Amino acid sequence: MFLLLFFCIFASKTVIFVSKFSYLSVIMNISSVISRRLGLGEKQVQAVIGLLHEGATIPFIARYRKERTGSLDELQIAAIEAENTKLEELERRKQTVLATIEEQGQLTPELRRRIDECEDSVELEDIYLPYKPHRKTRADKAREAGLQPLADLLLKQDPRTDCRREAQRYGKPDETLQGARDIIAEQISMDERSRNAVRREFAYTAMIRTKEIKQLTAQRAQEAANYREYFAVDEPLKRISSHRLLAIRRAETEGFVRVDISCDQEKALDKLARLWLHNNSNAAYEVEQAMEDSYKRLLKPAIETEFAASSKQKADAEAIRVFAANLRQLLLENPLGQKRVLALDPGFRTGCKLVCLSAQGDLLYHSVICPHPPVNKRAEAETILLKALHDYCIEAIAIGNGTASRETEAFVREVLQSSNQKSSNLQINETIPVFVVSENGASVYSASKIGREEFPDEDVTVRGAVSIGRRLMDPLAELVKIDPKSIGVGQYQHDVDQAELKRSLDQTVESVVNYVGVDVNTASKHLLTYISGVGPVVAQNIVNYRAEHGSFPDRRALLNVPKMGAKTFEQCAGFLRIAGGTNPLDNTAVHPERYAVAARLQQAKMSGREVRLEDFVSEEVGLPTLQDIWRELDKPSRDPRNQIEEFRFSEAVHSIDDLQEGMSLPGIVTNISNFGAFVDMGIHKDGLIHVSQLRGKTLALHQHLTVEVLSIDRERNRISLKPANS
């Protein structure tokens, strides 16, 4: 009995040991592959994977674990995470493939070795293809008819073989030869060498071609006109830009064009011939027919689908990269800060919705003014505006950039200039800055669940105006409440992989929020949700605790929040600020785990002696962390964003009809893509600076610049620009 028990314990421990050994070997293999692919040290990769598996976030690893990762930045860590996810999925797929082949009784040691060593999903699927369950094919039917021996005989291509005589043994020669060719065709198509040969030819010579679909209704034909530059595309696939490929695919989805991707057929068949044709015998002729059929019916469609998918994937990745870069710039847009703001959501027929906000963004007052046609209550609008400016001590004005924006801006500036010239008890500071603010996303917020939660008793127009005002005060705090896809800085965002787009944009928002940091005593739950390690549940708990117990006096008090365990605190503490708390370090990016060394550095700094950071290096704290701490001590509670600057459009233009070629106008960059930058000149239609006009210059989202009008296509409502003096 004792021996049996000992054996059972030993056996179970052996299984655990083997499984752990297997897991560790997989991790080591994955680290090695990622290291080669990304050109990073294997120890760096192992450290990142280990930290990710421990539950650490990318912002936390990048900022607070530099010694372990060799100071890898967020992009490098994110790349490791993405590669690790792919390779872990590949490992899971390998196990499925191995199990399936083993069930069939066809798993040899050599086949297992090839699968285990495989590092690419395409290669793995090629290995698996002959064993993969599939619906019955022409070749399957031929095998069931007993024609496999005939196919094998033909493949030998013996010059002495009389093909028709051999075929007659199995039935009617024409039918049996066709069946044998079907078997050979499938065999060729499933052969790794064949597939790789055709892939190489596609990689070198594949062309993407489009053909216009002309049988359209009048309305559909009008819609199709927007895609006319894609009606007769004939370009090398490897050279086509991502935005053109996505536009072509959208035109295909809309039913305006047919798309074909094909390589040089003659060269592809020549490559296959080198693999499968050995002489000029009659049997070789049968194999050649099967080979051509295999290419046209099986190989080309399969490889075309592969290249269509891979090219789309690359285009998606590039579009998502551009979107994420634009989003990052938008989230880091310069804030006005905590000032009292009057915000206007402009309009003609329904008037302009006016709201006044406190320095904390609370709604104090709202009204509607109608200074424009068709209502034309200008005097009343002026009175309401002046009273609101006076009563709420307004320090800045935000005007949405939608319909009637220019007219509303002109009205406001005129009122400010003339206010103190009129006999009135309301003395207004005519130098109150006026800002035109993007409305993108404001209407989405106003109708959203978040908007309803924040202002349950107000209608959508009030919520929209509040969003415009708050966006001026702190773009980051307001934009996190809006789905990034609604902000309007994407490129073909509805055409790309939606899951990958969401992952990338969420990662971007998380990165920016943690880069800036948030005041835990004032931040909304929506902003707190993106803090490293927090999430929606803990964010709500922080807000609830704050409401019940008042402001947090220090970071340690966060541990009293429900579900704020030690791990969550470790991940989030450095990114949460406490202004005016009991410990000045709580208002910096210094992590509580490094307060002791920060205190020693501060003491050395205050001594007036020269401080050598190298003298403070220890086993736990290296030079990179010490440099970060020193920067925080040098500029505590700093905001990495700059102060917003006032901007004015030209008074000479209000619509595309006012434009002339050669005009120089002030503008704001509203969107950046691979093919150029879009610029708002205050005429409700953005112009395009084509990438060829930038000449290596890099523009930033919402950058102020002067542009020159190159050309105007009024029929298509398009404006071409270039940077002035370029």
Report the location of each language-model feature.
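Short boundary/loop segments of OB/S1/cold-shock single-stranded nucleic-acid-binding domains
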Residues: 327-332, 641-661, 695-698
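Duplex nucleic acid-engaging cores and interfaces of nucleic-acid transaction enzymes
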Residues: 60, 76-79, 86, 90-343, ...
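A glycine-rich phosphate-binding loop feature that marks nucleotide/adenosyl-phosphate handling sites
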Residues: 200-207, 344-348, 402-404, 427, ...
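Structured, non-catalytic alpha/beta "coupling" segments that mediate domain-domain communication
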Residues: 100, 114, 251-264, 274-299, ...
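Hydrophobic alpha-helical signal peptides and transmembrane signal-/tail-anchor segments
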Residues: 1-11, 16-18
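S1/OB-fold single-stranded RNA-binding interface
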Residues: 125-129, 138-139, 143, 153-155, ...
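Accessory alpha-helical DNA-binding modules that contact the DNA backbone or grooves
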Residues: 57-58, 73-140, 145-171, 515-643, ...
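Long, charge-rich intrinsically disordered scaffolds of nucleic-acid metabolism proteins
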Residues: 123, 435, 441-442, 446-516, ...
